[in-house]
């Protein structure tokens, strides 16, 4: 992994991401920060289940990953680390860790399947996903978004493959031994 990408992933904050301009399976990632906060707290099981469902359903649908997915994976990776550390004393953390491990397996399978096919090269930098030309409109308009999807190239090939590649990279960084511990 390129050093710039490691640094970017490691230092990325939820507030650095324009979630409202990133596509998901069912719209935009506007609500991601609130759902990530619920998971981070690992408090109420019902709330954790609801937020986990909202995130995972919007990050992956029928093996398709979306613009918000790599960014979601950065934060879910951090949450998984925390959940694993707390799983011995917090039943919600234990539940969440198991569910996240299953979801990560799904994301990694999506990457593997896509990587087996002919594909474009990924964007050079994770941060390139947030370049102005790669973001969707500032204001969400469901009809406008649907029309863009109906076009042949809703996403350029390199951008689309980058959804998969950088989702994998986010997982990879957090599965490697690190000096953070």
What residue ranges belong to the model's regions?
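N-terminal "cap/leader" segments of large eukaryotic alpha-helical scaffolds
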Residues: 2-45
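Boundary/linker elements of alpha-helical solenoid repeat scaffolds
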Residues: 12-23, 36, 55-64, 151-164
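HEAT/HEAT-like alpha-solenoid repeats
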Residues: 36-41, 77-81, 85
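HEAT-repeat alpha-solenoid elements in large eukaryotic scaffold proteins
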Residues: 48-56
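Positions within ordered alpha-helical repeat solenoids
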Residues: 57, 61, 78, 82, ...
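Short sequence/structural elements of tandem HEAT/ARM alpha-solenoid repeats
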Residues: 67-74, 116-121
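Acidic, serine/threonine- and proline-enriched intrinsically disordered linkers and terminal tails
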Residues: 106-173
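Conserved small/polar residues in nucleotide/adenosyl-binding loops
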Residues: 174-181
């Amino acid at each position: 992994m390129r050093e710039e990408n490691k640094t970017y992933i490691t230092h990325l904050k939820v507030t650095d991401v324009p979630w409202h301009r990133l596509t998901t399976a069912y719209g935009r990632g506007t609500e991601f920060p609130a759902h990530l906060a619920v998971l981070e707290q690992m408090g109420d099981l019902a709330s954790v289940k609801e937020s986990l469902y909202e995130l995972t359903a919007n990050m992956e649908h029928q093996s398709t990953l979306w613009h918000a997915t790599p960014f979601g994976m950065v934060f879910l990776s951090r949450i998984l680390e925390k959940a694993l550390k707390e799983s011995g004393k917090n039943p919600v953390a234990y539940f969440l860790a198991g569910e996240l491990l299953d979801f990560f397996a799904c994301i990694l399978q999506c990457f593997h399947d896509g990587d087996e096919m002919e594909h474009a090269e990924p964007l050079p930098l994770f941060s390139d996903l947030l370049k102005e030309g790669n973001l969707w409109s500032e204001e969400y308009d469901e009809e406008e978004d649907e029309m863009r999807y109906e076009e042949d190239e809703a996403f350029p090939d390199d951008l689309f493959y980058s959804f998969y590649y950088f989702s994998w990279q986010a997982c990879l960084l957090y599965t490697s031994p690190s000096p953070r511990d």
